[in-house]
Design a protein with these regions (language model features):
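C-terminal segment of classical bacterial N-terminal signal peptides
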Residues: 15-23
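Bacterial N-terminal signal peptides that target proteins for export
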Residues: 1-11
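Hydrophobic/aromatic beta-strand elements that line small-molecule binding cavities or substrate pockets
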Residues: 123-130
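Low-complexity, intrinsically disordered terminal/linker segments enriched in charged
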Residues: 104-109, 117-122, 139-161
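Short, solvent-exposed secondary-structure junction/capping segments
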Residues: 45-72
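Short, aromatic-enriched amphipathic alpha-helices that serve as compact interaction elements
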Residues: 29-49
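Surface-exposed, charged secondary-structure patches
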Residues: 27-29, 62-120
Length: 161
């Protein structure tokens, strides 16, 4: 039996695999808004640099994020904090969640999150809209903290005094 030198062929095959297109990350599907919010806070409570996925927004909120990014011209932009914790850093503790239905609209839901970021008591309302690809985050409103805010307003107009 005659053996051929296959090391070159093996190397070429491995090299082509290394540069082959990788499958895209699976899209985030939110089947339960409260469970999703809970999972984000569980990850944030562990510390580190966890950033929630970017494909969780309604087209309206996604467009405002894109606008904010374009108008920032590579700089920090209008959002200079992690809205999930209403701060630049910190670890959320004492999380409590409550789901509020929207009267007459089964495709809308509000999740109210109360927690502490350090010693600061926080309360955020997460507004979700259900579409063909599941639930998507449509807006966030801070009810406590240092200064109340609405995410969509900051993204479009900046901080309004």
């Amino acid at each position: 039996m005659k053996f051929q030198n296959t090391s070159g062929a093996v190397a070429l095959a491995l090299l082509s695999l290394a540069f082959a297109p990788q499958p895209a990350a699976a899209a985030t599907v939110i089947t339960d808004p409260a469970a999703f919010v809970q999972s984000v806070y569980a990850r944030l409570a562990k510390g580190g640099d966890y950033i929630p996925p970017e494909d969780i927004y309604t087209p309206h909120l996604a467009a405002l994020w894109a606008l904010e990014g374009r108008e920032a011209h590579g700089e920090v932009g209008r959002i200079d904090f992690l809205f999930w914790i209403d701060g630049q850093d910190g670890t959320p503790t004492d999380l409590r969640l409550r789901t509020v239905p929207v009267e007459g609209r089964l495709d809308r839901r509000i999740v109210v999150a109360t927690f502490k970021n350090g010693e600061q008591a926080e309360a955020l309302k997460f507004y979700f809209q259900k579409g063909v690809s599941g639930w998507k985050l449509d807006d966030v409103v801070s009810l406590k903290g240092q200064a109340p805010w609405t995410l969509s307003v900051i993204l479009k107009y900046g901080w309004v005094d």
